[in-house]
Every structure is written in structure tokens, then in C-alpha cells.
Amino acid sequence: LKKICPELDSINIGGGFRIKHNLGFDYDYQYMANEIVSTIKNVCKKNKVDMPNIFTEFGSFTVGEAGAVIYSVLGEKMQNDREIWYMIDSSFITTLPDTWGIGEKFLMLPINRWENEYQEVHLGGLTCDGHDFYTSEEHINAVFLPKLDETPKEAPANGTPTGEKEPLYIGFFHTGAYQDQLSGYGGIKHCMIPSPKHVIVDIDKNGQLEDWLYAKEQSPLSMLKILGYVK
């Protein structure tokens, strides 16, 4: 190409850098980067042309770790007398569309109850859709999460018990690439599932973590307005 177009001075090698989607992930990024550069260098040297500017499109690698989705488990149900299902408070189809569209798996961990006994479970979304799930058949070898219990929430600062129970929270991490873009925010989603609240977590100038609410959970009224039922 350089011989055909002498003005050509750059090459775009596209994407392809992997991102960590499981705890056993092991990938030598430096080795791969060195291989890319050395291969281009050797080809240029062999053909006696100058080294080009090298551009990449490592989208998932660049932004993937910047996103996470947190769900709470609404309850547990038994199916086929052997499958334990945890039902989450949202939908995988709407919040993690790649789990439904291409069977993508993500780094998943419980947020609390780490000290509880673990059991193999299947995760089901809130919709009636038969594809709204995250299980070993489709995404990973097996899903193990802490057992649910009846532990009440700790009393608030005023010491008055709430009587409510602490739910199990589970987090899906490294979701920063494509999930929000595909799902969108503020529109009408599958089965009228509202867009979840979005929280930004950052580090301030003193190195301390800070967070703020970027967007509230989508309200039923806003969805009705979009559909034209409310003026």
C-alpha cells in the first residue's frame, strides 16, 4: 500500500484486546503489544518503507472496566425439583444486553454475605421473557452465590429497627463497553423495565473516593409520557 500511495503514513489495526471477564483471566498485554509493533516493524523493514503511525480501536479494553451493574435478589424459587433460581430486581436483556444477544459473560461477584454458605444457582430476570436469564448453560461453567437468609438489616443510626431484611446484592463488573450504549437511558425498554439509577464513582484531588447520583431511576410517569398516555 505504501508503494501505491507514498503519502500513506498510518495504519489502523482495529480492536481485539481482551478484557477480564472471569477471575481466572491471564493475558500478557505487554507481550501482545510488543508482537504487534515488532511485526509491523519487520514488514516495513523487509519492504524498505518507513514505520507508520499505529492506531488501535481497543474499545472494550479501554472503557470496559469503567462500568458495573448492581442487582438485588428479590427471592429464590425451585424449578424442576433441582434447579435453584435467584430472581433479580431488573432484566438482563435491558441492562446487560450482550448476555442475551451474544451469550457474553461478565465478572460476577456477590457484594455482601460472603460469609454465608454458597450454592449453585441460576439467575433469572424480572421479565416474562424466556431468554432473560444468566446460567451455566449459556454463559459460564456454573454460578455459585451465597445462600439467602433471614438476617435483618442493621438498625439505623437512631437505633430504630426497620424490620426489613438485608437482600443479597450481586455485581456484574467490567460492563463499561456497549451495555449502556445498547440499552440506552430514558427510552422504552423490553417489558417496560425502567432504566436503573446511574451512580458515578470517582477519586477526588485528595485521592479519596467520592460518588454522586448521575441519573435517577426512570419513573413510570416518564415512560407513559413517551408512549403518549400522559401529556
Task: Please report, for each region that a protein language model flagged, where it lies by residue.
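Conserved N-terminal phosphate-binding loop of PLP-dependent enzymes in the Aspartate aminotransferase
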Residues: L23, D28
